[in-house]
Amino acid sequence: MQYPTVAQVVLDGPDARKLAEFYRQLFGLRYRDGDEPPPDGEPDPRGADWLVLRNPGGVQLAFQQVDQLPEATWPEGEHPQMLHLDTTVPSVAALNKQHERVLALGGRLLHDRSDDPEEPLRVYRDPAGHPFCVFVHEVDPETDRS
């Protein structure tokens, strides 16, 4: 049997370029050809519509411009999240390093469980209000499929 393949995860936001830049810098991704930011002062028609970040060997991220997007009120509230990204790092030291990067890039800390001995993690909100997680997960490439 053949199954569909996930091609990309699409995140809506009121500023697609700003959101794409946040994730490009956070994950070290590159733009799809033609989606790169224009020179300063030039119009950015693609940035006001749809952008794609390539992730060699993984699922790509796309960003769609919307007029309004209420922030998700995680973990409960009027605007529950519909999707979030789970990302991993190999150690608590790496978790702490990424914490500084996320904040410097404009992310906001929502929940800090970095001292949890079983699964250290932090939950953040990206510049458009989407929650995402960074947690410690030591991967054994021979056995791990998560």
What are these regions (language model features)?
Residues 62-70:
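Short, solvent-exposed beta-alpha or beta-beta edge segments that form flexible loop/patches at the rim
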Residues 5-14, 48-55, 59, 72-98, ...:
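Vicinal oxygen chelate
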Residues 140-146:
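A short, polar/charged loop-to-alpha-helix boundary motif
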Residues 23, 67, 99:
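Short, flexible helix/strand-to-coil boundary loops that buttress conserved ligand/catalytic motifs
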Residues 1-4, 10-61, 104, 112-115, ...:
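Core segments of cupin and vicinal oxygen chelate
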Residues 93-99, 103-137:
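Short, compact, well-ordered microdomains
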